[in-house]
Amino acid sequence: MSRIVVLGSGAWGTAIALSLHRRGGHQITLLAHSPEAALEIAEPRENILFLPGFHLPPEIAITASESAVGDAEIVVSVVPSEFLRPTLARIRPYLRPGQIIVSAT
């Protein structure tokens, strides 16, 4: 089972997390930019702001803790280009050699 962190919890990040979950065989974590953003998605299990109408199953973890990146085998970056540099700076301490980084920005 692959451990995948989707970096960015907007419409695109949420859609990718759902798609990877539906394919099966992956442990998915959706990494939001703030605890408030994570809570807004985690409590209703839906990204009401950016992707309403799509239920997030309980198997998809939702967090704002950058340390989740350290446990991932694959990190999928879907943050808007204007926020990419500061976001990567925040997760850099948690990146490990051998991790696969995918840019879907």
Q: Where does each model-flagged region fall?
A:
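Rossmann-like NAD(P)(H) cofactor-binding subdomain of soluble oxidoreductases
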Residues: 56, 62, 67-70, 74-105
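NAD(P)+-binding Rossmann beta1-loop-alpha1 motif at the extreme N-terminus of oxidoreductases
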Residues: 1-51, 61-64, 90
